[in-house]
Design a protein with these regions (language model features):
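Active-site-adjacent loop/helix surface patches within enzyme catalytic domains
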Residues: 2-118, 133
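A short acidic, often aromatic-flanked loop/helix-cap motif at beta-alpha or helix-coil junctions
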Residues: 58, 127-128
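Acidic carboxylate-rich catalytic motifs and surrounding loops in phosphoryl-/glycosyl-chemistry enzymes
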Residues: 117-126
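Acidic, glycine-anchored loop motifs typical of Ca2+
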Residues: 129-136
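Secreted/luminal cysteine- and crosslink-motif detector
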Residues: 145-147, 166
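Single conserved hydrophobic/aromatic residue that forms the stacking wall/gate
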Residues: 157-166
Protein backbone atom coordinates (compact mmCIF):
# COMPACT_ATOMS: atom_id res chain seq x y z
CA UNK A 1 0.00 0.00 0.00
CA UNK A 2 1.12 3.56 -0.66
CA UNK A 3 1.46 6.12 2.13
CA UNK A 4 -1.78 6.13 4.13
CA UNK A 5 -3.36 9.59 4.20
CA UNK A 6 -7.13 8.96 4.33
CA UNK A 7 -9.74 7.08 6.31
CA UNK A 8 -12.93 5.91 4.61
CA UNK A 9 -15.87 5.03 6.88
CA UNK A 10 -18.35 2.39 5.68
CA UNK A 11 -21.41 0.58 6.99
CA UNK A 12 -22.19 -3.08 6.43
CA UNK A 13 -25.66 -2.19 5.05
CA UNK A 14 -27.33 -4.55 7.50
CA UNK A 15 -30.44 -3.90 9.54
CA UNK A 16 -30.24 -2.45 13.03
CA UNK A 17 -29.45 -5.15 15.59
CA UNK A 18 -28.10 -7.65 13.04
CA UNK A 19 -24.53 -8.30 14.17
CA UNK A 20 -21.76 -9.54 11.88
CA UNK A 21 -18.12 -10.37 12.48
CA UNK A 22 -15.09 -9.61 10.35
CA UNK A 23 -15.08 -13.33 9.47
CA UNK A 24 -18.68 -13.06 8.24
CA UNK A 25 -17.76 -10.12 6.01
CA UNK A 26 -14.65 -11.96 4.82
CA UNK A 27 -16.86 -14.87 3.70
CA UNK A 28 -19.27 -12.46 1.98
CA UNK A 29 -16.45 -10.65 0.18
CA UNK A 30 -14.83 -13.93 -0.92
CA UNK A 31 -18.21 -15.04 -2.30
CA UNK A 32 -18.16 -11.83 -4.41
CA UNK A 33 -14.69 -12.67 -5.79
CA UNK A 34 -12.45 -10.77 -3.38
CA UNK A 35 -9.35 -12.61 -2.13
CA UNK A 36 -10.14 -11.48 1.44
CA UNK A 37 -12.19 -8.95 3.41
CA UNK A 38 -11.95 -5.50 1.85
CA UNK A 39 -12.00 -3.47 5.09
CA UNK A 40 -9.10 -3.00 7.48
CA UNK A 41 -11.28 -2.71 10.59
CA UNK A 42 -14.80 -3.79 11.53
CA UNK A 43 -16.68 -2.27 14.48
CA UNK A 44 -19.30 -4.62 15.84
CA UNK A 45 -22.57 -3.56 17.49
CA UNK A 46 -21.07 -3.82 20.99
CA UNK A 47 -18.16 -1.56 19.96
CA UNK A 48 -15.60 -4.36 19.63
CA UNK A 49 -12.98 -3.73 16.94
CA UNK A 50 -12.00 -6.65 14.74
CA UNK A 51 -9.10 -6.48 12.32
CA UNK A 52 -9.69 -7.23 8.69
CA UNK A 53 -7.29 -6.81 5.78
CA UNK A 54 -3.72 -5.95 6.71
CA UNK A 55 -2.67 -2.34 6.18
CA UNK A 56 0.34 -3.63 4.22
CA UNK A 57 -2.01 -4.74 1.43
CA UNK A 58 -4.08 -2.42 -0.80
CA UNK A 59 -7.66 -2.20 0.42
CA UNK A 60 -10.74 -3.38 -1.46
CA UNK A 61 -13.32 -1.05 0.03
CA UNK A 62 -13.49 2.09 -2.12
CA UNK A 63 -13.06 1.69 -5.85
CA UNK A 64 -14.73 4.91 -7.02
CA UNK A 65 -11.54 5.97 -8.85
CA UNK A 66 -11.01 2.57 -10.47
CA UNK A 67 -7.74 0.71 -10.19
CA UNK A 68 -5.52 3.73 -10.84
CA UNK A 69 -2.78 4.89 -8.49
CA UNK A 70 -5.20 7.55 -7.21
CA UNK A 71 -7.68 4.88 -6.05
CA UNK A 72 -8.56 5.31 -2.38
CA UNK A 73 -7.82 1.59 -2.00
CA UNK A 74 -4.14 2.45 -2.48
CA UNK A 75 -3.83 5.05 0.30
CA UNK A 76 -6.68 4.76 2.78
CA UNK A 77 -7.80 2.78 5.79
CA UNK A 78 -11.25 1.21 5.42
CA UNK A 79 -13.35 1.10 8.59
CA UNK A 80 -16.77 -0.58 8.55
CA UNK A 81 -19.35 -0.35 11.32
CA UNK A 82 -22.02 -3.03 11.47
CA UNK A 83 -25.40 -1.55 10.59
CA UNK A 84 -26.57 1.27 8.36
CA UNK A 85 -30.15 0.18 7.65
CA UNK A 86 -33.25 0.66 9.77
CA UNK A 87 -35.78 -2.12 10.48
CA UNK A 88 -37.41 -1.45 7.09
CA UNK A 89 -34.13 -1.69 5.18
CA UNK A 90 -33.81 2.07 4.60
CA UNK A 91 -30.44 3.85 5.06
CA UNK A 92 -30.09 5.15 8.63
CA UNK A 93 -27.41 5.93 11.17
CA UNK A 94 -27.87 2.86 13.35
CA UNK A 95 -24.60 3.14 15.26
CA UNK A 96 -24.86 2.24 18.91
CA UNK A 97 -23.28 4.54 21.51
CA UNK A 98 -20.50 1.94 21.84
CA UNK A 99 -19.88 1.97 18.08
CA UNK A 100 -19.75 5.77 18.03
CA UNK A 101 -17.24 5.87 20.89
CA UNK A 102 -15.08 3.15 19.36
CA UNK A 103 -15.13 4.80 15.94
CA UNK A 104 -14.03 8.15 17.39
CA UNK A 105 -11.23 6.44 19.33
CA UNK A 106 -10.05 4.44 16.30
CA UNK A 107 -10.06 7.51 14.04
CA UNK A 108 -8.08 9.47 16.66
CA UNK A 109 -5.52 6.65 16.93
CA UNK A 110 -5.16 6.35 13.15
CA UNK A 111 -4.75 10.14 12.84
CA UNK A 112 -1.91 10.00 15.37
CA UNK A 113 -0.21 7.05 13.66
CA UNK A 114 -0.53 8.26 10.05
CA UNK A 115 -0.48 11.66 8.39
CA UNK A 116 -4.24 11.64 7.77
CA UNK A 117 -5.48 14.54 5.66
CA UNK A 118 -9.11 13.47 5.24
CA UNK A 119 -11.76 11.33 6.88
CA UNK A 120 -14.62 10.56 4.51
CA UNK A 121 -17.73 8.46 4.26
CA UNK A 122 -17.83 6.06 1.34
CA UNK A 123 -20.60 8.20 -0.18
CA UNK A 124 -18.25 11.24 -0.11
CA UNK A 125 -16.01 9.54 -2.69
CA UNK A 126 -18.80 9.60 -5.29
CA UNK A 127 -18.02 11.67 -8.39
CA UNK A 128 -18.88 15.38 -8.41
CA UNK A 129 -21.27 15.08 -11.34
CA UNK A 130 -22.28 18.73 -11.57
CA UNK A 131 -18.73 20.08 -11.15
CA UNK A 132 -19.66 22.25 -8.16
CA UNK A 133 -16.58 21.19 -6.19
CA UNK A 134 -18.72 19.36 -3.63
CA UNK A 135 -20.32 15.92 -3.75
CA UNK A 136 -23.95 16.59 -2.91
CA UNK A 137 -26.55 14.06 -1.70
CA UNK A 138 -28.12 13.87 -5.16
CA UNK A 139 -24.72 12.67 -6.47
CA UNK A 140 -24.13 9.89 -3.94
CA UNK A 141 -23.65 6.50 -5.56
CA UNK A 142 -24.76 4.96 -2.27
CA UNK A 143 -25.79 6.21 1.19
CA UNK A 144 -22.95 4.40 2.99
CA UNK A 145 -22.14 5.00 5.83
CA UNK A 146 -25.55 6.65 6.42
CA UNK A 147 -24.25 9.61 8.46
CA UNK A 148 -22.30 12.78 7.69
CA UNK A 149 -18.70 11.75 8.32
CA UNK A 150 -17.24 15.13 7.35
CA UNK A 151 -19.20 17.04 9.98
CA UNK A 152 -18.55 14.42 12.66
CA UNK A 153 -14.83 14.05 11.94
CA UNK A 154 -13.48 17.46 10.94
CA UNK A 155 -9.70 17.64 10.70
CA UNK A 156 -7.28 20.44 11.34
CA UNK A 157 -4.90 19.89 8.45
CA UNK A 158 -1.99 21.48 10.29
CA UNK A 159 -2.42 19.07 13.19
CA UNK A 160 -4.22 15.95 12.01
CA UNK A 161 -6.59 15.15 14.84
CA UNK A 162 -10.36 14.88 14.87
CA UNK A 163 -12.24 17.82 16.32
CA UNK A 164 -15.83 18.86 16.54
CA UNK A 165 -17.04 21.34 13.96
CA UNK A 166 -19.75 23.79 14.83
Amino acid sequence: MNKIDSIIIHCSATRAGQDLTAKDIDRMHRARGFNQIGYNYVIRIDGTIEKGRSLTVDGAHCNTKGFSESSYNKHSVGVCYIGGLDANGKPADTRTPSQKATLRQLVAELCKEYDIIEVLGHRDTSPDLDGSGEVEPKEYIKACPCFDVRSEFCLLYTSPSPRDCS
